[in-house]
Amino acid sequence: MTQWEVVIGLETHAQLSTVSKIFSGASTQFGAQPNTQACPVDLALPGVLPVLNRGAVERAIRFGLAIGATVAPRSVFARKNYFYPDLPKGYQISQYEIPVVQGGQITIQVPANEKAGKQAYSKTVNLTRAHLEEDAGKSLHEDFAGMTGIDLNRAGTPLLEIVTEPEMRSAAEAVAYAKALHGLVMWLGICDGNMQEGSFRCDANVSVRPVGQEKFGTRAEIKNLNSFRFLEDAINYEVRRQIELIEDGGEVVQETRLYDPDKRETRSMRSKEDAHDYRYFPDPDLMPLVIGADWIARVKGEMPELPAAMQQRFIEQYGVSAYDAGVLTSTKAMAEYFEALVAKAGAANAKLAANWLMGDVSSQLNRDGIDIDACPVSAAQLALVLQRIADGTISNKIAKEIFVTIWDEKAADEGAADRIIEAKGLKQISDTGALEAIIDEVLAANAKSVEEFRAGKDKAFNALVGQAMKATKGKANPQQVNELLKKKLG
């Protein structure tokens, strides 16, 4: 039986976070009434000329520097010719032979798959290029009975199309890459990453070939995948479809396909064009884009610390594990919250801060369906909770209750933890004399558990600890309870 190898390359369109469009001054704001953000340039009225948006170029430079690519000192805009109702000019301004960003790579972390018996691993994906281009408009097929409306608000919106080499070998790798790229463009501030609004969408080029064969199989391109789940499902379906087709004696044709999320399958859209079908030629209305070394140096000086560098710094500076550092730098907002938390709680509490951020805080964020930048508990408020754990004022269990109270109250005061501790009488009982008296009562009331422990049953000891904590309503210092019980039980 033939063993098949999957070959995947991704083309990702990241909408650049400029206020105006790439070749006009019209707004890029999402959600406006149709055709209210389309100026004469976007409408392709006679006599208009495009003017390149400097901000779009700087965002492309920033991306190129972040992935270790070559930023071309001279790149050229080209006309990509095709007819579609939402493309008023009859061509799209893009880059073809000389893109602004050339090469580069992104390291991805592919998670373990227990069902398939695969362990987690890292992989470096090489990029072919990233080029600037304008978006087309939007066809409104469902708004008019028997007709199609055209909304040109999106026409001319700046895009950075990021193209990988065909190096990914599974849907899991493709999704890991897409997530890494999504996180990076948001970290750099060049794209808002809103997949529902179409700010970040992927086209997947998928083919299969017998294991060991060098020649690529015929590829199908799946267009406009705007969620990671859709990307994974579409690739998995397409791989199965191609293998079944070949094994049944058929041939895969080069075509563009669409993914139907309701049926969880791909369907044919049109035959896939080659580059020569678009009749690319340099745009005579635009000068070559010249990027000097001084411009690159200035953009580099304004770059934020990159995730990989920050991850390594967290390991060295705060003593957290590589895994924890990876989670803490998963988004820029998460990393900033962690650093603010440690700054307030003290470096000695860095590991405690990391555990809380990845545990209780993340759990509450998931419960409410919000991101860390919308967290109702500020870093200063949480830092005080952690300090009260560290100085023995409260137990970890009580701290969780206080945290949830601050969260639900949406308290504004930085000293909320101390206020709640005082108001509810939540201070941990650390007085040895008081604890000894409580433990004596627990031992007297639980003679059977005492006998079982002395007979070698360790579970009985845990039962006694539980009874002591219950007697103090969770306010006892657990460590002291353990020590005193061991002392009294001999």
Swiss-Prot record:
Query: Which GO-annotated molecular functions does the record name?
Result: asparaginyl-tRNA synthase (glutamine-hydrolyzing) activity; ATP binding; glutaminyl-tRNA synthase (glutamine-hydrolyzing) activity
Report keywords, A-Z.
ATP-binding, Ligase, Nucleotide-binding, Protein biosynthesis
Q: Which GO terms describe its biological process?
A: glutaminyl-tRNAGln biosynthesis via transamidation; translation
Q: Which InterPro entries does the record cross-reference, listed alphabetically?
A: Asn/Gln-tRNA_amidoTrfase_suB/E, Asn/Gln-tRNA_Trfase_suB/E_cat, Asn/Gln_amidotransferase, Asn/Gln_tRNA_amidoTrase-B-like, GatB, GatB_C_1, GatB_Yqey_C_2, Gln-tRNA_amidoTrfase_suB_CS
Organism domain of life: Bacteria
Q: What is its EC number?
A: 6.3.5.-
Question: Record's SUPFAM superfamilies?
Answer: GatB/YqeY motif, Glutamine synthetase/guanido kinase
Reaction catalysed by this enzyme: L-glutamyl-tRNA(Gln) + L-glutamine + ATP + H2O = L-glutaminyl-tRNA(Gln) + L-glutamate + ADP + phosphate + H(+); L-aspartyl-tRNA(Asn) + L-glutamine + ATP + H2O = L-asparaginyl-tRNA(Asn) + L-glutamate + ADP + phosphate + 2 H(+)
What Pfam families does this protein's entry cite? GatB_N, GatB_Yqey
Per UniProt, subunit arrangement is: Heterotrimer of A, B and C subunits.
Biological role: Allows the formation of correctly charged Asn-tRNA(Asn) or Gln-tRNA(Gln) through the transamidation of misacylated Asp-tRNA(Asn) or Glu-tRNA(Gln) in organisms which lack either or both of asparaginyl-tRNA or glutaminyl-tRNA synthetases. The reaction takes place in the presence of glutamine and ATP through an activated phospho-Asp-tRNA(Asn) or phospho-Glu-tRNA(Gln).
Q: Which PANTHER family match?
A: GLUTAMYL-TRNA GLN AMIDOTRANSFERASE SUBUNIT B MITOCHONDRIAL AND PROKARYOTIC PET112-RELATED, GLUTAMYL-TRNA(GLN) AMIDOTRANSFERASE SUBUNIT B, MITOCHONDRIAL
Which protein family is named in the record? Belongs to the GatB/GatE family. GatB subfamily.
Return the protein name. Aspartyl/glutamyl-tRNA(Asn/Gln) amidotransferase subunit B
Originating species = Burkholderia pseudomallei (strain K96243)
